């Protein structure tokens, strides 16, 4: 009885049927002054998720049944299945996160499941009106749900629902592939079904198809009048070819009964995308070597790639080597797409070391506007701190949240180094986070090293802790003794430089000088690598003042490591950190040289003069001209091209190999398939001479094929495969690659007739993007 007093008698009044593309008018009556909110969702989606119309009163008063106040929480800690069923829907989405970067940037406009919700409406007289726009593509039943609550102070609530059927007079079903590449020729069709009551056996239907700029008609008629009997359907076939107009290609279809003034429209899109993925290439060379001399004081430099204009970047910079290197590395780190803890930290390190160096930022061209640099810096540093916090557990920091591995010891030390570096450069550090990580490093340093790699990590951690102001004399002595007993030639290892800096901070100058090596030997560690070792060596030399090598020698060593094919994001970040320490006034000046585009670009481009760097950004430029009267000594050029290549896929192998096969149901290699056939796509990759623990393979599907989910919806089984993701037009494998070939496969179905160019399959080391391979080329015919 008490519940009955608090129940609002909500009523939903709506038409039982509505046409696609029209508006459904709904009136909600709550019986008294109330706040009302309306929802309308595709009934098929609600049945799929088992969603029940909300019952607010039952939820609000369930704990007051029988006048008993419940204070136990066990049913919330371990809720029953019945309690959860219908309360928590099956969630999706998440594509705005890092993984969303693997989506097709030229994706078509899809037809999302129908869902509508209103803002809460104040119904002063107890009634509220709503207008629900129905998409032109929607056909089926929708559930209209209303929830209402009384004014504050008197608890009363209620809900109601109604079903409405959406059905058109004519049903249009375009049949098109999801994606195509420029040059693909394929068949399309428009199916028109006549559901107009009383139209008869001889109903005449006028159909018009409007093609977008990116599609050109090869055969067929786009405007026809068809005889479509009531309850029957007819097909309009046509053949089109995709042009070099990238992006969403909407095909619009209009149909109406002859003589009617109420046409039905339907739009379906396909994606026209290039055959290859976005690729960035860059070269850095002395101006005298990179450019071809022309007239006196004039040089020409060619840009080798022909790119589509979408997101294209072609930029040439002329600058002293050190300035150019820091700008280039900062730009390169900003462009990396993976969001693991290490890469987030590496991306932020240059911003930390430049934070309190306004004069150097002016030389680099990063001084103006100041607010822009601060915004970029805060974004990068904030992301790094968030990544550390998300991956931190008990003071240890993992590469990915929840993924423990042999690299965890290094990542924890690297995170501690980053947080201490923030403090050294005057940035606020989260005390609780830093405290737990540094405490874990203290525990790690106190343990006996398990092997050479572990000993290096402990020496690195001790160096980080000492910079935080902790007394690490005993730790340095213990780790040094371990190396003396267990390692050969360790005096030229990076740990010697760490020991030297540690002893120098302890005012043990003689011991520091003895320990600092005159040169640095490399390591095979993928994390504390040769590139990071060189950067630490340069940093410790500058900090101790022990002039074992000149700045020019250190600079050359850092540039070799940072711009080598095997450079990791750690190498690039640490090299930038060391180069900032080395940066000083350069004699060479670039502002006496003018850069212009000599061929290829539609415009003259954008000239950039920032600090000691002179650059020209001219997308589409194929040849640059550099003119000036000054000396070229000490000046370098940096050419960056980023974008999507025109033409067929360029096969390449840079320290990695990848291949792809299409197999029929008998396991035979095929280049043709019939409509409806199931095809197995097999992608194989290897890395000669080494193991890559974190590789990503992206296989783009040709138009005419669509990926098929495994029966159990799971991941295809394969050695080394750690993660598999499926997109509309591509699949992504995250795997460990070895010298022995490893193969991964998935199923695809032939869904559209035509001749389709084969897009790229690309493999790369996630942390050394220069180690990569691309395969593709050829054509697939679907009959």
PLM feature spans:
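C-terminal segments of large proteins
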Residues: 1-783
């Amino acid at each position: 009885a008490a519940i009955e007093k608090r129940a609002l008698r909500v009523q939903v009044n709506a038409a039982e049927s509505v046409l696609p593309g029209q508006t459904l008018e709904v009136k909600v009556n709550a019986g008294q002054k109330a706040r009302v909110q309306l929802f309308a969702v595709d009934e098929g989606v609600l049945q799929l998720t088992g969603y029940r119309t909300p019952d607010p009163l039952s939820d609000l008063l369930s704990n007051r049944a029988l006048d008993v106040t419940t204070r136990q929480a066990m049913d919330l800690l371990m809720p029953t299945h019945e309690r959860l069923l219908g309360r928590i829907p099956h969630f999706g989405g998440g594509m705005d996160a890092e993984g969303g970067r693997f989506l097709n940037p030229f994706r078509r406009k899809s037809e999302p499941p129908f869902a509508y919700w209103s803002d809460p409406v104040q119904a002063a007289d107890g009634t509220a009106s709503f207008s629900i726009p129905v998409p032109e593509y929607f056909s089926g039943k929708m559930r209209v749900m209303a929830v209402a609550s009384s004014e504050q102070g008197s608890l009363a609530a209620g809900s109601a629902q109604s079903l409405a059927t959406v059905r058109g007079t004519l049903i249009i079903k375009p049949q098109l592939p999801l994606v195509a590449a420029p040059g693909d020729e394929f068949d399309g069709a428009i199916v028109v079904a006549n559901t107009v009551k009383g139209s008869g056996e001889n109903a005449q239907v006028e159909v018009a198809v409007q093609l977008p700029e990116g599609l050109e008609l090869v055969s067929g008629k786009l405007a026809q009048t068809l005889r479509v009997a009531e309850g029957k359907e007819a097909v309009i076939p046509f053949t089109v070819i995709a042009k070099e107009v990238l992006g969403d290609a909407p095909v619009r279809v209009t149909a109406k009964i002859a003589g009617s003034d109420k046409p039905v429209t339907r739009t379906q899109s396909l994606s026209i995308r290039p055959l290859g993925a976005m690729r960035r290439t860059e070269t850095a060379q002395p101006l005298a070597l990179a450019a071809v001399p022309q007239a006196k004081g004039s040089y020409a430099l060619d840009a080798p790639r022909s790119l589509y204009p979408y997101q294209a970047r072609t930029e040439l910079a002329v600058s002293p080597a050190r300035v150019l290197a820091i700008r280039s590395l900062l730009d390169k780190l900003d462009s990396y797409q993976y969001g693991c803890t290490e890469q987030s930290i590496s991306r932020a390190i240059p911003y930390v070391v430049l934070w309190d160096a306004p004069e150097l930022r002016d030389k680099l061209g990063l001084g103006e506007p100041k607010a822009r640099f601060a915004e970029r810096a805060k974004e990068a540093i904030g992301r790094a701190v968030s990544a550390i916090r998300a991956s931190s557990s008990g003071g240890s920091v993992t590469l990915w949240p929840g993924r423990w591995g042999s690299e965890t010891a290094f990542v924890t030390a690297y995170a501690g180094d980053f947080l201490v570096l923030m403090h050294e450069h005057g940035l606020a550090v989260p005390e609780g986070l830093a405290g737990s990580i540094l405490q874990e490093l203290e525990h790690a340093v106190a343990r006996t090293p398990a092997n050479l790699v572990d000993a290096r990590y402990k020496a690195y951690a001790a160096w980080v802790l000492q910079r935080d102001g902790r007394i690490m004399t005993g730790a340095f002595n213990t780790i040094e003794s371990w190396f003396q007993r267990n390692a050969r030639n360790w005096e030229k290892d990076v740990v010697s430089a760490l020991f030297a800096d540690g002893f120098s901070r302890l005012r043990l100058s003689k011991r520091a000088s003895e320990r600092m090596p005159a040169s640095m030997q490399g390591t095979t560690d993928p994390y504390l690598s040769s590139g990071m070792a060189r950067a630490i060596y340069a940093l410790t030399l500058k900090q101790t003042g022990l002039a074992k090598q000149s700045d020019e020698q250190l600079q050359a060593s850092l540039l070799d490591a940072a711009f080598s094919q095997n450079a990791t994001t750690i190498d690039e970040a640490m090299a930038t950190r060391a180069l900032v320490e080395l940066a000083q006034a350069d004699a060479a000046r670039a502002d006496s040289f003018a850069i212009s585009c000599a061929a290829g670009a539609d415009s003259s481009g954008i000239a950039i003069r920032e600090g000691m760097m002179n650059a020209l950004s001219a997308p589409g430029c194929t040849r640059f001209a550099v003119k000036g009267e000054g000396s070229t000594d000490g000046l370098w050029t940096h050419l960056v091209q980023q974008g999507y290549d025109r033409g067929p896929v360029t096969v390449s192998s840079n320290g990695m190999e990848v291949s792809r096969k299409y197999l029929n149901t008998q396991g035979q290699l095929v280049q043709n398939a019939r409509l409806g056939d199931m095809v197995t796509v097999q992608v194989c990759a290897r890395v000669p001479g080494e193991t890559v623990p974190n590789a990503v393979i992206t296989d783009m599907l040709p138009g005419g094929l669509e990926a098929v989910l495994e029966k159990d919806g799971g991941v295809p089984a394969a050695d080394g495969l750690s993660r598999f993701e499926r997109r509309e037009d591509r699949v992504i494998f995250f795997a460990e690659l070895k010298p022995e070939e490893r193969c991964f496969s998935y199923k695809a179905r032939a869904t559209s007739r035509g001749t389709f160019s084969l897009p790229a399959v690309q493999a790369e080391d996630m942390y050394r993007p220069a180690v990569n391979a691309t395969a593709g080329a050829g054509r697939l015919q679907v009959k």
